[in-house]
Amino acid sequence: MKDLSVNLLLEFPEEHRVERVLWIDPGMRGLYAIDIRDANALPEFYQAEEIEKMRDAGEWRVVENDPWLLALADENISEVYRDKRDSAWETIRPLIFDQPAIFDAIARSEAVKRGMEESGVTKQTIYRFLRRYWQRCMNKIKTHIR
């Protein structure tokens, strides 16, 4: 697991799935990752032994070219999308830095409830914003780009 890093993409060819590493336990006990193509994906925890076993069996490989790793300057984004992006960012910003808790389903549910109360945004919208953030390089710029 020492050769893995946050934001790295892992392809599982047999399952036609690509997952982004969201967080790695400092004690190297495991990591959270999310499927970047699944519109309903949520972070999933993998034990270190499980990841290493799958790697040794050739079940996943590192993706060299990240489709979301492109530089976008603000001036190249329309004002409408910038406003939507900024609004989405302000909604999830208080939630995303509580790591690893935000990746846990129960803790995330509580955080989303607080986010709903503070922002007036629906649960579905907050989950959509979080998903986009996690799936698209964990970068503010790409939270609302299609």
Could you tell me what each predicted segment is?
Residues 1-146:
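Secondary-structure boundary/capping micro-motif
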